[in-house]
Amino acid sequence: MLKMGVVLFTVLVLFPLATLHLDAEQPVERYAENKQDINPDQRSGFLTFALRQGCCPPGVCQMAACNPPPCCP
């Protein structure tokens, strides 16, 4: 009975923990490899697009009682 408990613990607890650790590292490596292929002009394009979006929803900063934060256009 003790041997079966040790085998079950190993299979159900330790083995999944080891595989999850490997899976967690792979997306970061893939993401870094994908970004290395982009030239600097394209990288800055992503950033400027995000900055142009603004942080306020449309119509919020036009209200009379609104004190717009500095990010509102």
UniProtKB/Swiss-Prot annotation:
Expressed by the venom duct. One of its GO terms (molecular function) is ion channel inhibitor activity. The modification 4-hydroxyproline is found at P57, P58, P68. One of its GO terms (cellular component) is extracellular region. Disulfide bonds join C55-C66, C56-C71, C61-C72. InterPro entries: Conotoxin (IPR004214). It is found in: Secreted. Pfam families: Conotoxin. Keywords: Disulfide bond, Hydroxylation, Ion channel impairing toxin, Secreted, Signal, Toxin. The keyword Disulfide bond applies. Residues 25-52 form a propeptide. Residues 1-24 form the signal peptide. Belongs to the conotoxin M superfamily. The cysteine framework is III (CC-C-C-CC). Classified in the M-4 branch, since 4 residues stand between the fourth and the fifth cysteine residues. Conotoxin with small effects on sodium (Nav), potassium (Kv) and calcium (Cav) currents. At high concentration (10 uM), it has no effects on the peak sodium currents, but induces a ~10 mV shift in a polarizing direction in the current-voltage relationship. At the same concentration, it increases 19% of the peak potassium currents but does not induce a shift in the current-voltage relationship. At the same concentration, it inhibits 31% of the peak calcium currents but does not induce a shift in the current-voltage relationship. This is Conotoxin Vr3a. It comes from Conus varius (Varius cone).
